[in-house]
Amino acid sequence: MKFLFSLSALLIISHFAHAQTTQRARDLGIPFDGIPGKYNAITDVPGVMVGFKTLISGSGKLVEGKGPVRTGVTVILPKGKTNDGYPAAWFSLNGDGEMTGIPYIEDYGMGYGAIGITNTNSVGIVKDAIGSWNVKHFSKGEFVDYSFGLPVAAETWDG
């Protein structure tokens, strides 16, 4: 029993010790153009805006259909509150996941407006919300109106 306790303690301690010494790519000598900004964050890039909403409801053991809930959405505006285009590409690491707007990105190598990141089951509503926001802010009310565009919304795992 003492052996199992000692082994468990050693594994836990080594995990935290490793987590605190993990180096970043730059620390390992991997070269990148430029230098990190003040916060080393996407918001250091001039013109980029990021917003998020985290939903936390309930506590304790997970009861399917009841909670607790830990989820949210992040929205990135690469060109701020404009509908200006920006270079875009996409990549699938494991072939599992949902993302809207891929055909346009593949065909033109461009994105327009906001990028949403949320849980799997909310990709559709986030895409629709981005489209509605685009219409509200960029529509000129013309017969042909491209302001809804092809919003990009992608999933990330909430777990």
Residue ranges and their predicted role:
Residues 1-20:
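Bacterial Sec-dependent N-terminal signal peptides
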Residues 20-159:
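Alpha/propeptide regions of enzymes that mature by internal proteolysis
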